[in-house]
């Protein structure tokens, strides 16, 4: 487009920047930034979000990524539009396409969920999501400190990603504390319960499995239900437990059965194999039921595998 003398709008640059950020090519992302500057365009929060994403996805991983994340969050505080792309934005709104979806941000799937995300927190959404992906607890806590100093309030997405980060780093207590502080004062979406339960199962420690079980029981008490994706993810995670009574996996299976929800084949297969590894009679009702569900799924998918 540049070769043909077409002047790109700010929104087009930002789309390109975020698309390249997904590949981790920081050199190409910086090239877009230089082109924007040359065109008289300033960087807005979506540009800084793209820069954070680019460094998060960079391969091989860079040692300065945590510092870069903090740097971009700080720089974003002075963002402004030099050219406001009002017409494009209006068109996107009419088409019901949010900025989060347009720029493929981590919050895209929640953009139309009332009260799930506070849109003024975009840069923190992306930065804390990056911390969770990278498993960088130190960077997370630096961001949360910056967040608190700006007198912002957490939204569900911020808490969900912070909980995920803590759990990936093995800090179950901090994850539980953050979850409980948020849930005690605000409506808590099912996704947050699922994030805590699934993450607590990492490593299958006694403490983690206890937290996962308690979290699922709270979901049931509050009349939350698992959808097929949530159920599949949780069952797949719980089915990896090699010791213990398989209590959590059984509980998740029962939650799904109550709603007549059949999880995806890999989760059912993993659950079945976990049951078979335990000393369960071949005519046990649970084992028979799971085997039947597995057979039915296999018929839909193709040639039968050997599950015995």
Q: What is each stretch, according to the model?
A:
Residues 1-308:
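A basic, Ser/Thr-enriched alpha-helical scaffold prevalent
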């Amino acid at each position: 487009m540049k070769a043909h003398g077409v002047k790109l709008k700010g929104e087009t640059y930002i789309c390109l920047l975020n698309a390249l950020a997904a590949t981790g090519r920081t050199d190409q992302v910086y090239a877009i930034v230089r082109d924007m500057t040359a065109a008289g365009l300033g960087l807005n929060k979506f540009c800084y979000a793209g820069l954070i994403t680019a460094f998060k996805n960079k391969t091989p991983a860079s040692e300065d990524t945590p510092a870069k994340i903090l740097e971009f969050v700080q720089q974003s505080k002075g963002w402004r539009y030099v050219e406001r792309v009002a017409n494009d934005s209006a068109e996107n709104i009419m088409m019901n396409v949010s900025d989060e979806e347009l720029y493929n941000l981590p919050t895209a799937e929640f953009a139309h969920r009332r009260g799930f995300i506070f849109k003024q927190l975009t840069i923190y959404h992306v930065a804390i999501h990056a911390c969770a992906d990278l498993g960088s607890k130190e960077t997370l806590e630096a961001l949360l400190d910056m967040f608190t100093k700006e007198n912002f309030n957490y939204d569900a997405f911020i808490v969900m990603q912070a909980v995920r980060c803590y759990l990936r780093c093995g800090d179950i207590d901090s994850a539980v504390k953050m979850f409980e502080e948020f849930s005690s004062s605000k409506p808590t979406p099912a996704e947050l319960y699922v994030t805590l339960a699934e993450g607590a199962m990492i490593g299958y420690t006694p403490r983690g499995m206890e937290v996962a079980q308690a979290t699922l029981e709270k979901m049931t008490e509050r009349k939350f239900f698992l959808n097929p994706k949530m159920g599949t993810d949780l069952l797949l995670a719980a089915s990896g437990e090699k010791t213990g009574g398989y209590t959590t996996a059984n509980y998740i299976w029962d939650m799904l059965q109550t709603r007549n929800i059949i999880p995806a084949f890999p989760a059912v297969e993993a659950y079945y194999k976990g049951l078979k590894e335990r000393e369960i009679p071949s005519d046990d009702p649970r084992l028979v039921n799971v085997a039947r569900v597995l057979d039915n799924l296999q018929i839909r998918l193709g040639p039968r595998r050997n599950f015995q």
